[in-house]
Curated annotation (Swiss-Prot):
Cited function: Binds to the 23S rRNA.
HAMAP family: Ribosomal_uL15
Record's keyword terms, sorted: Ribonucleoprotein, Ribosomal protein, RNA-binding, rRNA-binding
Protein name: Large ribosomal subunit protein uL15
Organism whose genome encodes this protein: Chlamydia trachomatis serovar L2b (strain UCH-1/proctitis)
Amino acid sequence: MIKLECLQDPSPRKRRTKLLGRGPSSGHGKTSGRGHKGDGSRSGYKRRFGYEGGGVPLYRRVPTRGFSHKRFDKCVEEITTQRLNEIFDNGAEVSLEALKERKVIHRETSRVKVILKRALDKKLVWKDAAIVLSEGVKSLIEAV
């Protein structure tokens, strides 16, 4: 059985918004709850995430953990045999410098992997140890 004292408002209760700057008796008059001077009292001020009032923030107090190799990792790019067919002539030497000159790879690239997409139409000379051939490309070259 429902009792009268157990009835609840079906809609979520909403707190009435405080009126700011409406006299001293409101508790939010004059400075409107912003205090005197400083950044927070100015218009347009938004506190940066993690800001702790000028003290050293938590993310700088806590020691860093681990180590990332991202800065030191070697940049590796992939090239397909189809692309090599388009770029190089028959009997051409394939090296990192040759690929960089033709702007096929970035300047920072230190290693290239050749992947089989189509059969190589041309006989190419592999000059650089930094160019790694996939198993499919190796078997294709050995067959020719």
